Design a protein with these regions (language model features):
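P-loop NTP-binding site
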Residues: 90-113, 290-434
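FKBP-type peptidyl-prolyl cis-trans isomerases
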Residues: 1-89
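Conserved nucleotide-binding/hydrolysis micro-motifs of P-loop NTPases
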Residues: 61, 78, 132-135, 186-189, ...
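Nucleotide-state-sensitive switch-loop elements of NTP-binding domains
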Residues: 89-100, 105-232
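Canonical P-loop GTPase G-domain recognition
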Residues: 231, 235, 239-311
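Short, aromatic/basic amphipathic alpha-helical patches
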Residues: 139-146, 257-263, 398-403
Length: 434
């Protein structure tokens, strides 16, 4: 309920006496502060989330030069922090940080560490994950970590723009975040034209930014080593980036890489980042706050047929397993299964595993990124997100064969609870603003 010292987010349409729409936007404010009209605030007092009200501001009231009608919808309400309760303290605009970058480039790790850092500053943070599939390791991990999150599934942000917009508004209504990280699927590009610019156009009151992540190890090798159409996607991601975050830079000597990046991407902001270093995360967030992100950012010159062909070269498998072991070796079997699946002759985009709903293990094109010790357990669950350069049938058979090997080796029973294996469809963005 709206009362003194609550943070309120409302959407409103403002019309003059002739019925002309002057504003159609949203605002977040401290109720009782001079941030918005005191007459409007008095009329909103006592309303709850989802409630609506029409308020009339008559000519002469608060220096109004006409009769103005406000059709108001209350989106969200929460208690103000002591800092926010300082009368007149401005409530900063919602920050939407878009992240793109190739599979396994370190986006999720950076988001997780940024959430931890911002939580120390009492900033409410939320995350939107995105994938071509429907069972997301990263989405379930953020849920386990207690970070408010939503998922945009079965396609990229650009092809499911309305779902992304709905996810943001859901989080605003239910969690009132100050910052939302939106992580696009790693096989996606052209986000400036299809996501960033539409958000900027439809929600100018938000502070929207865009970062593209790239694994320093892959950049250092000069090629991601995939089919040329997949390499095309990777190159286009970097080409459109206003900010390039070279992640995992602590794993290489980046001297030569920095020279190459300056030569290939002049004029771009390039950060070399170890996302487990809090100072690096703080620098990235500060950079996003200081660089102007405007509609003048160039949209890609991109061949969608080549882009679509590249996505179709990747097979995607989402599978949930339960492992039962009479010898308390369920976790041992799960970890052995992970290693067996990773032993493939096909090029790995990203292998992500979630063990027992909370332990994430990953393999990328550059190799393994996580390790885990097994503990005695009679049962374990394993969620698999596999993105590999092959066809769906070959990938499904590879995983099935790995399961058979581990069942025999560990004398355990592995049950498939859900499974989906497919190739992404042709990218058809909802919007594209050149």
């Amino acid at each position: 309920m709206i009362r003194e010292n609550t943070i309120v987010r409302v959407r409103y349409t403002m019309k003059n006496s002739r019925g002309e729409v002057l504003e159609n936007t949203s605002i977040t404010y401290l109720h009782g502060s001079p941030a918005i009209s005191t007459i409007l605030q008095s009329q909103l007092q006592g309303l709850g989330p989802g409630e609506q009200k029409q308020v009339l501001l008559k000519k002469g009231q608060e220096d109004a030069d006409d009769d103005f009608t406000f059709d108001i919808i209350v989106d969200a309400i929460r208690e103000a922090t002591p800092e926010e309760q300082k009368r007149g303290a401005p409530i900063p605009p919602l920050k939407i940080h878009l992240l793109s970058g190739f599979l396994g480039s370190g986006k999720t790790t950076a988001i997780h560490q940024a959430c931890r850092l911002l939580a120390k500053e009492n900033t409410i943070v939320a995350v939107i994950t995105n994938d071509q599939g429907s069972r997301l390791v990263d989405g379930e991990l953020f849920t386990h970590l207690g970070i408010p999150s939503r998922q945009v599934i079965n396609g990229c942000f650009c092809c499911n723009y309305n779902d992304l917009d709905a996810a943001i508004h859901y989080l605003l209504k239910h969690n009132t975040p100050g910052v939302v990280f939106a992580e696009s699927v790693g096989s996606c590009t052209d986000l400036i034209a299809t996501v960033f610019k539409p958000l900027l156009q439809q929600h100018p009151e938000w502070q929207t930014t865009a970062s593209v992540f790239a694994d320093a190890q892959l950049l250092n090798d000069n090629s991601v080593g995939f089919d040329e159409t997949i390499n095309y996607i990777y190159a286009k991601q970097l080409e459109e980036a206003p900010v390039i975050v070279v992640s995992k830079s602590d794993l290489i000597d980046s001297t030569n890489l920095q020279k190459k990046m300056r030569s290939h991407y002049p004029g771009k902001t390039i950060l070399y980042q170890d996302s487990f270093n809090e100072e690096h995360i703080a620098r990235w967030l500060q950079t996003l706050d200081t660089i102007p992100f405007t509609k003048d950012l160039p949209s890609l010159d991109i061949d969608y047929d080549t882009y679509g062909a590249g996505e179709a070269k990747l097979a995607w498998l989402d599978q949930e397993l339960r492992i039962d072991s009479l010898t308390n070796k369920a976790q041992h079997a799960a970890l052995a299964l992970i290693e067996t699946i990773a032993q493939t002759n096909s090029r790995i985009g990203h292998l992500k595993f979630l063990l027992d709903g909370h332990t994430k293990i990953s393999y990328t094109a550059a190799g393994a990124t996580d390790t885990q010790d097994a503990k005695p357990a009679s049962a374990a669950t394993l969620l698999i997100n596999a993105r590999i350069q092959t066809d769906p049938q070959t990938l499904a058979e590879h995983v099935k064969h790995a399961i058979e090997i581990i069942e025999q080796q560990y004398a355990c029973a592995i049950h498939t609870l859900s499974e989906s294996c497919f190739q992404p469809g042709y990218p058809r963005p909802t919007h594209r603003l050149a």
